[in-house]
Amino acid sequence: MTTTFEYTADDIIQALQQMQDERQRDALMRFFKTGAGDYGEGDRFLGLRCPQTRMVVREVRGRVALSEVERLIASPWHEVRLCGFLLIVEEMRRVLPTARRNTEAMAARRNELARFYLRHARQANNWDLVDMTCPKILGYWLLYPQADGTMPDRGILDRLAESDNLWEQRIAMVTNWMLIRHGQFEDALRIADRLLAHPHDLIHKAVGWMLREVGKEDMAVLEDYLERRYSQMARTTLRYAIEKMGEPQRQAWLRRQP
């Protein structure tokens, strides 16, 4: 089946701009830390709520060429970039394997979308852009065989973790969410090890969050990891990791001395 591409980046940007809200813009700029020296310094907002952006994505999904998506994620506007990245999520969803269908063409498309995302990963330059997209793009890609039958190289997570870019480092950690949900913890624990000593709070939170997700699937795995690593963790990482434990158990971890 041939896809007819009906929407351009300009069409989508116009639809988003028609909903811009100055009051909401100011609130978002504060929330996403766009001030001088903050992690979101210089980012620009139209003032859209996430459901508004998703509404546009639902309207145009499957009918936007990757070349137009590339223009969206190059935009200076946060919501336009988000829209572009969410369109990649939708494209990945369309080619996920099912019990009845998993063609070489679908596998090739998954690889194309993942590679596209990796080339533009630094444009996912705030935590929401990372968290809403990387598990459903890179995470899904890493779960399934490529067209030649081999599995994608999960060493990409290590390379992202070793990047000098904060957002690529967060991608390295948060991508594991999809793997964790499928009972695969090894990569998450390995990347957590790489990032435990990271200086930034956004990485402390990401590592703790993924450890918490491991615990939701298998508490014994989380507890074993904490026994070995809690003394090396930032306090924020530990608090996030143990958040879903019972209160007595949580307090016991918090009272431990390194």
In which residue ranges do the predicted regions lie?
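Alpha-helical scaffold domains
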Residues: 1-258
